[in-house]
Amino acid sequence: MNDADLEHAYAEYLRLYSSVPRTLCHDDLLPFNVLCANGHATIIDWEYAAILPYPTSLARLIAHGEEDESAFFYMTQADKDYAIEYYFEHLLKENGIDYNDYRRTLDYFLLYEYCEWIMLGVKYNETGSERFQKYYAKAKEHIKSLA
């Protein structure tokens, strides 16, 4: 990634990845894969599903949601906060996962989502692209909260 701070934080993500409990994850949980009607939501397109660390799908959903109503993945901060709390209260708490550990782990999985686009930008020499710049800025801002 050519950034010492990001590489250090990413190394911590990799360390966590190997120790986090696994579960069935969608692994492409983005708004276009959630159909909502009559107060119910159905998740579709399970082709990338796998047994992965538990925060994988939630991190993808939250990392790519934007508060701009014209954004491809619109999601308010209130929606994100609700999803984070609901996931803990209804799935993790009963399995003995500590809330602070959950939030720390989720933060590193969010970092991964940002770094994925950074690594692709570096690999394909597209570091000047709008997408690279957006996710690089998100990652740099996000690692401040990891300290």
Task: Enumerate the predicted regions with their spans.
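An alpha-helical support segment within catalytic cores of ATP-dependent transferases
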Residues: 1-26
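Inter-domain helical "communication" segments and dimerization helices
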Residues: 1-6, 72, 78, 96-103
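Extended, well-ordered alpha-helical scaffold segments
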Residues: 2-9, 78-83, 131-142
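Hydrophobic HxD+1 residue recognition
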Residues: 29
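Catalytic activation segment of kinase domains across protein kinase-like and atypical kinase folds
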Residues: 32-60
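Active-site activation/catalytic loop segments of kinase-like enzymes and analogous catalytic loops
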Residues: 56-95, 110-128
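Helical subdomain adjoining the active site within ATP-dependent kinase catalytic cores
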Residues: 96-108, 113-147
